[in-house]
Amino acid sequence: KLIDELEEYKKRYDEALKAHQADREVIDDLLVKLSNLEAEINLLRRRVSNLEEEVSRIKKDNLYFVNELNKARANLDQETLNRIDFQNQVQTLLEEIDFMRRVHDQEISELQAMAARDTTSENREYFKNELSSAIRDIRAEYDQICNMNRTDMESWYKLKVQEIQTQSTRQNLEQGYAKEEVKRLRVQLSDLRGKLADLEGRNSLLEKQMQELNYQLEDDQRSYEAALNDRDAQIRKMREECQALMMELQMLLDTKQTLDAEIAIYRKMLEGEENRAGLRQLVEQVVKTHGLSEIGETESIRVLKGETASRTSFQRSAKGNVSIQDASSDGKFILLENTHRSKEEPIGEWRLKRKIDGKREIVYTFPRDFILKPGKTVKIWARGQGVYSPPDQLVFDAEDSFGVGSNVQTILFNKEGEERASHIQRSSHTIS
């Protein structure tokens, strides 16, 4: 039955290990997915940052082109004002020319009048020819000046209008391209922000799942440790019960042998075959263990046939995971053990008191910050009896022996002075 239960606990332990390993693999997969998502999110964030920089650059270009367009419009307005000014100048020049023409006509009229008063035909013909020549020269010069001014004005205005139209067309094209590019980047930025929101949602969901799995893993670990502790406690209890039964059986067998030996002795005494020379020594040890989990007792009976009998009993108890497993009767060492499988026990500044026959008392104090590992033992040697090898072996430099006696009490106290474990040895001698 014990073997079946042990197999059942082992099976549960293996299943718990497999479940623990499966949870570990799931967590590793989730961590890989989380890393990939974080990398993708970082990539999208960099792309969004680049697009935002591109949008900012295009906005700057657009602002530059708008400023250039405003400058062109201002130049157009200025050129329009200049055109009006030049037209006014042309009008002024035309008026001056007209005024000069009227003045010249008046001078011509005066000259004609003077010529009319001149009765000489030759003089009249001469002045007439001179006047006609002067009029032709003035008209030719006037026509030439008007044509030159008109041609220059038309060429200049055509050139300016063409430049303004070309610049306006180019700016309109660039502004349209910039608007299309901004629209495209806005659409792309909106898509990337949507993807980023989806990925952040998935990331949050995966983090939540990973947190739940971590909680579940912690619960499984606690359940697993509790199951292990229960199994260890049951196994320890079963072993103690088996040991108690074995000790009881051994004690019965030893009692039977003792009775058989006493019967044989009495039979020989009745037959008159007593022979006290060369007595044989009969040594029997009976070990009996009591208590469910904390208290243990051991008895040793030493019989000297026909003379003396020596009886030694040991009693152990512990209030916690640290117990006194052994205290040598010759005073060489004391052995402590941490019976827990996974919990460390800080026993720094704890004290071991050993009282010999109710008189002499020996006290050993553990070093500060000393920790007894799970399932480990520590042996404290008296001076000169063992080797100093922490944390498994310590040496009590103050005494070369923990003392020897018939009634020896070894008690472990914590820093608060509370008793945590004890080991009691009692010896008695009888004469037969």
Curated annotation (Swiss-Prot):
Region (Tail), start-end ranges: 278-432
Annotated ranges, domain LTD: 310-427
Linker 12: annotated span: 112-128
GO molecular function: structural constituent of cytoskeleton
Region (Coil 1B) location: 1-111
Family, similarity comment: Belongs to the intermediate filament family.
PANTHER family: INTERMEDIATE FILAMENT PROTEIN IFA-1, LAMIN DM0-RELATED
Name listed for the protein in its UniProt record: Muscle cell intermediate filament protein OV71
